[in-house]
């Protein structure tokens, strides 16, 4: 009887360990989130007129394990509603040579994926456009949802910081400051390793 109790306890212990191992999350699964259809907008203006460029082709990844944040948009997918203005924008940005605007950096604030409320977060890294990179810090909100992560952020870009000459007509120039907004839902990346 003593041996059967030992075996029974060993089986129970092994079963308990197996259950615990099954419910411990694997680091890479559920820690990485990916989108290919995020939304980006930028607002700009000339005297007496403003306009917005929009793309729903923002590609991005957030890896909570490593705190990696990487987003980019092909500038050819940004539309302002006027074809000539779109072509002028691409020419100004030298998009044939530098087609992407990208942010690559780290989440530098705390984020609790167990909390389902929007949380203020801060990222820091390199933003690159027009072939020029600058270190920037961006504040936004990140929320864990049933679909994955929901991100919203905005910041202001100064074209001079990226060697972009604001286009203009006659005496009017586009404002050097561009307001940028992004929003995206990032489902879990089930192919993460």
Predicted segments with their positions:
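Bacterial N-terminal signal peptides
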Residues: 14-27
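Intrinsically disordered, low-complexity sequence elements enriched in Ser/Thr/Gly/Pro
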Residues: 8-10, 25, 83
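Bacterial N-terminal signal peptides that target proteins for export
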Residues: 2-15
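Short regulatory "switch" loops immediately downstream of catalytic or recognition motifs
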Residues: 1-2, 17, 108-111
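Residues marking helix boundaries in flexible regions
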Residues: 4, 25-30
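Low-complexity, acidic/polar, glycine-enriched regions of mature
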Residues: 29-193
